[in-house]
């Protein structure tokens, strides 16, 4: 008789995490790199493809594919194949026993369309016997057992997903999504750096690493000084203001969506809801973000915001 394994998965634009009933948790960057030629293949130790951080590190020698955008699988054959390869890899990493019956729950953006969910189901069905696609912020709340009077904000690379949790499965009117997420911060930071320091040379990967290491919202953040080449010469730049502005851009659309979810809820429970806002996802680790959202909520009657523990696995744990 085959073993039964339950898995929860956060199939994210930037990172994919899996939690299994066998006690395994693992995360891989959502990138697949395919060898360009025989030299590339030799460089990769004879492998045709590599995954995650290794793929990004070898991006000059591979065809690098990032198959998800705004939390959804891109609808082209290259991306679908890359997701299949990525799922196969992460299942191998999770050491699921061969021949197991696999039941899975996959988190998706709060306002993902029916077609988008169908694409996730059809791709993942090659690896699982039964699958449910659920709202990613609801998965965070479910895993932490916050099932009533809670507003969950899941901040990923492609989307910021919000969900109003009130003791039932969320309906469409309980959910909101906006796209000023991690990728948008990267794009805005790159734009500001190009405008204010046109002589500096940098790549998208360098910008992402700066954000992940130093992201902060607030007027009292520590100075952020980084080194970029200028005509080949390493040169130091103070980018504190640019980074703060890029990160703060997430606050207004998030607060607007929160207030919309509060204002359209039963007035008797609105105060409880506004005082129980939960931040999850990789973007929740931005220093000062909880305080910035609280400060912005003062205009609407205030609120209390807290960050989940283990944001990397909060979604897959709940799923």
Predicted regions and their residues:
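Nucleotide/phosphate-binding catalytic cleft detector across ATP-hydrolyzing
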Residues: 1-42, 49-155, 165-277, 284-314
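Short glycine-rich anion-binding loops that position phosphate/pyrophosphate groups of nucleotides
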Residues: 158
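Positively charged, low-complexity, intrinsically disordered RNA-binding extensions
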Residues: 161
